[in-house]
């Protein structure tokens, strides 16, 4: 798959996220995909699905914006921002109603049109501070 098609697949996944279609978002991933950077996510689509279902339950209707996207060979890298309202339990934190903004960076590796590995690093400390679970800096 060309770098242009990989970038297009990422943008399509983002559009699916923003339309509320988790299955459409997850269509980007290979069934044996690996998501690195978040604790407790085992290899494979079932574990990745559970991770995102928990996030969506806590931040329903969240928006995903890709700020920068770069591609080379079979890899796509992007800087992203997730914004939403904390309306469900998140990591044992009851809903706060707080509007959150969580920036991050992800690198995706593609094979045969599917993401096989994703390295994602988001500002989890900043998110927990916004939710009042950690003191502000």
Specify the residue positions occupied by each region the protein language model found.
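A solvent-exposed, acidic/Ser-Thr-rich amphipathic alpha-helical stretch
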Residues: 3-8, 22-76, 80-86
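Conserved functional loop/turn residues at catalytic and ligand-binding sites
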Residues: 21, 114
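A structural signal for short, well-ordered beta-strand segments
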Residues: 80-82, 104-106, 118
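Exposed beta-sheet edge and beta->alpha loop/turn motif
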Residues: 85-112
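Low-complexity, intrinsically disordered terminal/linker segments enriched in charged
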Residues: 117-137
């Amino acid at each position: 798959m060309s770098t242009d098609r990989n970038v297009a697949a990422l943008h399509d996944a983002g559009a699916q996220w923003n339309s509320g279609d988790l299955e459409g978002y997850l269509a980007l991933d290979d069934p044996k995909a690996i998501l690195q950077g978040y604790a407790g996510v085992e290899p494979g689509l079932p574990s990745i699905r559970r991770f995102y279902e928990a996030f969506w339950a806590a931040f329903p209707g969240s928006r995903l914006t890709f700020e920068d996207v770069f591609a080379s060979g079979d890899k796509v890298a992007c800087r992203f921002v997730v914004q939403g309202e904390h309306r469900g339990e998140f990591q044992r934190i009851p809903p706060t109603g707080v509007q959150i903004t969580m920036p991050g960076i992800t690198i995706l590796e593609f094979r045969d049109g599917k993401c096989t590995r994703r390295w994602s690093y988001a500002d989890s400390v900043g998110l927990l501070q916004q939710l009042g679970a950690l003191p502000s800096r």
